[in-house]
């Protein structure tokens, strides 16, 4: 079992070599992705992201601000990695087939909670899920969710 390190990624520099570093829907929440990548770049030669990305220039500012997100175009993400000599070696899009079942799953589970259990964060999650369901076609035009593998 691996030890857990409690740290802000912006302040963390690993002292171990890793086969792979994995970001699951978290890269978009980094304040400074360049700093984080610089911190971890000497500890791995492979980084995998499952990440939201912009597909259009219609930036959903109010939505992403509620979640403290920075959603980049894939070419911007690639440039962050390119600065550290990482190349995109694999890309697979998921949102077209995963958005609707994911939203339905969240809504079904949120419906099981009573009003006392619905904290402000849970209320925001529910509001977001309903927004995504009602605006699915627009969301799918503007935002993607992909697995991106970067290697050097």
Language-model features: where?
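A short His-aromatic
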Residues: 25-30
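Short, glycine-/aromatic-enriched active-site segment of Class I SAM-dependent methyltransferases
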Residues: 49-70
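Conserved Class I S-adenosyl-L-methionine
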Residues: 90-152
């Amino acid at each position: 079992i691996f030890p857990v390190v409690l740290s802000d990624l912006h302040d963390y520099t690993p002292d171990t070599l890793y086969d792979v570093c994995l970001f699951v829907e978290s890269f978009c929440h980094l304040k400074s992705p360049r700093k984080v990548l610089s911190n971890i770049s000497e500890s791995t030669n492979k980084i995998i992201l499952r990440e939201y990305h912009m597909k259009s220039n219609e930036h959903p500012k109010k939505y992403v601000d509620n979640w403290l997100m920075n959603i980049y175009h894939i070419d911007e993400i690639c440039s962050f990695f390119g600065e550290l000599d990482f190349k995109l070696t694999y890309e697979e899009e998921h949102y077209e087939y995963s958005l609707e079942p994911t939203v339905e799953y969240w809504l079904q589970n949120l419906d099981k909670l009573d009003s006392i259990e619905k904290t402000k964060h849970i209320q925001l999650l529910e509001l977001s899920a309903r927004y995504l369901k009602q605006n699915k076609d627009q969301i799918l035009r503007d935002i993607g969710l992909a697995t991106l593998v970067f290697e050097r």
